[in-house]
């Protein structure tokens, strides 16, 4: 699998932008009002609800891609952004500059090193479209839609949880073997994606000032 293609490169930032949140302020108070849940096993409903309650509009990331086509991991750094109501952006800043933007049903890819700017429609990529719809469902708290597209497995408690997603439909399976999210409360720490051919990508989110 080549994570450099538009289709697959858009998947990871999409996951992060639609799910990366932080429980702060009112959301944190809401969690406390329901008692201390840190010692109780969490469910997918609780994870999705926590992620829905709060999010950051900008977060830095470091992404490592492991592929049979590479002699060593490819590591890139950049910023993920969300602009309401539904614009998602991944900007790679190091070691080269690239930009991916998902707006409604359009995906735009820009690369300085490749001297290219291209826009595609999600209508032409059923597998990616199903992923988009599933994660939008996650952000809006629609657990039923998420379960419709993925087999979901949650382990851990509110302090430290993992959410494993495996596509149900053939289109999704052709693109992703699984997605594994790990985090605490309403924050995602890492997202790992494994492709059917064994290639994988791991993104670590870094809170703090963005470039």
Q: Where would I find each of the regions flagged by the language model?
A:
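Bacterial N-terminal signal peptides
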Residues: 10-22
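Flexible, surface-exposed loop/linker segments and immediately adjacent secondary-structure boundaries
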Residues: 115-161
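N-terminal leader/targeting segments and the immediate start of mature chains
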Residues: 25-62, 66-72
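N-terminal secretory signal peptides that target proteins for export/translocation
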Residues: 1-7
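Amphipathic hydrophobic-ligand
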Residues: 72-78, 178, 199
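Short hydrophobic/aromatic-rich beta-strand segments that constitute the beta-sheet cores
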Residues: 61, 88-91, 107-110, 163-165, ...
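An acidic-aromatic
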Residues: 79-130, 201
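Gly/Pro-enriched, hydrophobic low-complexity segments
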Residues: 143-152, 156-211
């Amino acid at each position: 699998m080549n994570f450099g293609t538009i289709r697959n490169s858009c998947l990871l930032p999409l996951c992060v932008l639609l799910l990366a949140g932080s429980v702060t302020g009112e959301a944190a108070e809401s969690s406390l009002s329901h008692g201390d849940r840190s010692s109780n096993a969490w469910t997918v409903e609780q994870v999705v609800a926590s992620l829905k309650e709060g999010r950051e509009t900008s977060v830095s990331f470091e992404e490592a891609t492991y592929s049979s086509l590479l002699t060593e991991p490819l590591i890139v750094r950049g910023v993920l952004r969300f602009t309401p109501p539904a614009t998602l952006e991944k900007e790679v800043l190091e070691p080269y500059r690239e930009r991916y933007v998902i707006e409604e049903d359009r995906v735009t890819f820009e690369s300085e090193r490749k001297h290219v700017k291209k826009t595609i429609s999600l209508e032409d990529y059923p597998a990616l479209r199903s992923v988009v719809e599933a994660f939008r469902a996650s952000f809006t708290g629609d657990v039923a839609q998420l379960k419709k597209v993925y087999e979901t497995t949650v382990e851990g408690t509110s302090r430290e949880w993992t959410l494993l997603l495996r596509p149900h439909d053939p289109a999704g399976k052709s693109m992703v073997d699984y997605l594994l999210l790990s985090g605490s409360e309403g924050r995602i720490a890492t997202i790992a994606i494994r492709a059917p051919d064994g290639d994988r990508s791991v993104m670590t989110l870094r809170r703090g000032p963005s470039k």
